[in-house]
Amino acid sequence: MKRFLNKINCSIKHNKSKFKLTFTKSKIRKNFKKMSIVKNVGSKNIEFHFNKKRSINTFLFTKVKKALNG
């Protein structure tokens, strides 16, 4: 999972009820019109940010992966 995140140059951070997914390369960030996207997953929010580098957590990536597939 961490290898996948490294391939797309992104990372995840958990902040209380929010999950943050961050793209670390500006080239990737420029492909997104909005700099932030929030998705609800049950009682949690998954928040995608494209501006700051964060650490990777495998458990959180699993949650994000489920949210994207769902």
From Swiss-Prot:
Quote the subcellular location field of this record: Mitochondrion
- Domain of life where this protein originates: Eukaryota
Sorted UniProt keywords: Mitochondrion
- Give me the Gene Ontology terms describing cellular component: mitochondrion
- Under what name is this protein listed? Uncharacterized mitochondrial protein ORF5
The source organism is Paramecium tetraurelia
